[in-house]
Amino acid sequence: MSPRHAAALGILLFSAASAGAPGGAKPAGDPAKLVVTVNPPAAAPGQEVEVVIRVEPNPGIKVNRYPKMKLQVPAAEGLVGGAEAAVGASEMPPLEHAEQNYYKTVDPVAVKVSVDSRAPRGAHTVPARFTYYYCVAASGYCAPERVSLTIPLQVR
């Protein structure tokens, strides 16, 4: 490779790396709406509830299968036990099948959470973290999205 080609390749790689992803800057606004549901809606102390996160991407946004979407619910003493779930692919598809890395319909992420046997009655909010990766179809910009969210928990 000539020095001129090597310099051009170096500039191209540096530009792509410094932009964070192909296509430049992060678009304004959230890439998707997150819908949180809890089943059953009200639980007794000692019971398990299923927390489900549905990702509804905004127009022009593709949600990646790899890396996996991840939901983390830390333990809250006297309220819930910790839980974690991941949904998606364990590895990236080959480049010739790159479109297979995007969901056509995004799978929900569900996790079973144990309500503490000493949990007080009433309405509570449980903090959680949700991470997913997305790409903007028009620009090729791709990035992780890390969201702190709250899970509504009704203890009866």
Question: What positions do the PLM features span?
Answer:
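Hydrophobic h-region of N-terminal signal peptides that target proteins for export
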Residues: 11-22
